From Swiss-Prot:
GO terms for cellular component: apoplast. It is found in: Secreted, Extracellular space, Apoplast. InterPro entries: Cupin_1, Germin, Germin_Mn-BS, RmlC-like_jellyroll, RmlC_Cupin_sf. Gene3D superfamilies: Jelly Rolls. This is Putative germin-like protein 12-3. Its main location: secreted. The keyword Lipid metabolism does not apply. Glycans are attached at N78.
Amino acid sequence: MASSNFFLLIPLIALVTTQAMASDPSPLQDLCVADKNSPVRVNGFPCKDAKDVSVDDFFLAANLDKPMDITKSKAGSNVTLINVMKLAGLNTLGISMARIDYAPKGQNPPHTHPRATEILSVIEGSLYVGFVTSNQANGENKLFTKTLNKGDVFVFPEGLIHFQFNPSYDKPAAAIVALSSQNPGAITIANAVFGSNPPISDDVLAKAFQVDKKAVDWLQAQFWENNHN
């Protein structure tokens, strides 16, 4: 009987192990340039025919050496993301990158990347950065923060809420980040909660945030911008 139970556990252990190690699927060939015009729907993109692949599928004149416009952002930041939607050669490679520009006192608001770990390096100015852990057994969510200067590096674990803030009153800041997914996704917390379409019931949000409905209605009436480009 014990032997029988052991063999029943083997597929369960295999399933749990597979789920724990899940990420962007590894490439099974040298190249799989995304064919965005294909009618086939898969997790990611199907491969372009190899005979139609060119060097330009792996190149993008992204101008990441130049500061991006931050004057129109209410958050005071601009995220220029280079993912598989912009660079088809990233398909199946499990990586993307971005440049983030911050106005004085600007921020990249609290957000998560549901499919990626992020590593950031400051290339101009200073940044106050941090992330919050998932719900712990003691009911707490621990905050980890650090002030970074030019050349410093910081990593944000996959799926955790994190932020960056430029503490300077008069100097801009900038960073380059790499992400462990061809399409990491971004969920800006305030935008998702108060700017969803259709809106989340104010009964739900008033209870969740322990405020009255007027406060929720006011927040939902604001313009929640997307600072990702």
